[in-house]
């Protein structure tokens, strides 16, 4: 018997009583105490299918037997409390992880493969080579990532690709300084320097949590008055999260969206109410009785913030600025009209106002961040490179040989603009 048989996820003490005896009705003789034992545990995750065996949800039982009698014998079963603050647990794991010392983030299984995003899962010091996106793959120059040779539909494709200048080799040259453009947790990613052909930085173990940072390299040019600290030549996303977000099989998505960080992640490890059924057997007579108990689930609450990317761009929207429409008026102010690829890479505010949407989707489509008119001039220079045609959509920014757009079925070639970490790519629209 039990006063109740349904318990909340955090109610771990489950009291019940057993009364076990036998008597001959009408004999006038006193009832006989019958010793008893719990002879079987069964559990169910759905209330329909039952599995025999003591389940993990039962942490302890005060006693599995008794002497019997007409007086009830009290027992207590203890349930496990499997409610987790997964966000706190993940952050603790990041803090407890062994600190890295000069780890090269581009080395994968003994071979170098570069990317625009590197995952960090512990405090310490790190480095990565100053290379355009995935321009090095498995230790060799990945030319197809920035100078594709088999484009289908070349009138709607850009080739070669551009950084601050035309990309002709994997290595970025001319960089004189490196800095954190922004970080979701202030001062978490710091000590950013250039050392030879590498960018070096540190992650503060005492502040580590799920976060994102953008590291950029610059030169000493002050091409535009607003950017006296130098032009950005390229930038990289440092994603601080658990290693298991990329622990997937070939052909599967990452376990979390790119750059995701939790603001809340808590609940029980089980999402349906779970049940345990006890079978009590009298030792002498073999008679049985059952009792069923339920432990309720706590719904999983999982919330967070992720990165948003405009089609073809390697960098996410700046998280502090809302998305907005760019001007379709007569102004030639690039910060109002939005920027083409070459200039968005060069500007130190490449994460901010240049990330805008076109206000005339019927003629341009809001994906056309590179669509410009020949009259768009700034500082005497057009906002496009020699290979960019005005008012054109470029389909191959993430899919190197795809100048066709929807329906292209050729081999996917990841580009230097792809924001994904090594081993992953932006999926093609099915």
Set out the residue ranges of the language-model regions.
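A short beta-strand micro-motif common to beta-rich folds, especially ectodomain repeats
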Residues: 209-221
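Surface-exposed, low-complexity/disordered Ser/Thr/Gly/Pro/Asn-rich loops and linkers
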Residues: 173, 181-187, 363-416
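Short beta-strand edge segments in extracellular beta-sheet folds
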Residues: 235-246
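Conserved hydrophobic ligand-interaction patch in extracellular adhesion modules
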Residues: 252-260, 300-325, 329-334, 338-341, ...
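Short, exposed coil/turn segments at beta-strand boundaries within extracellular/luminal domains
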Residues: 221-235
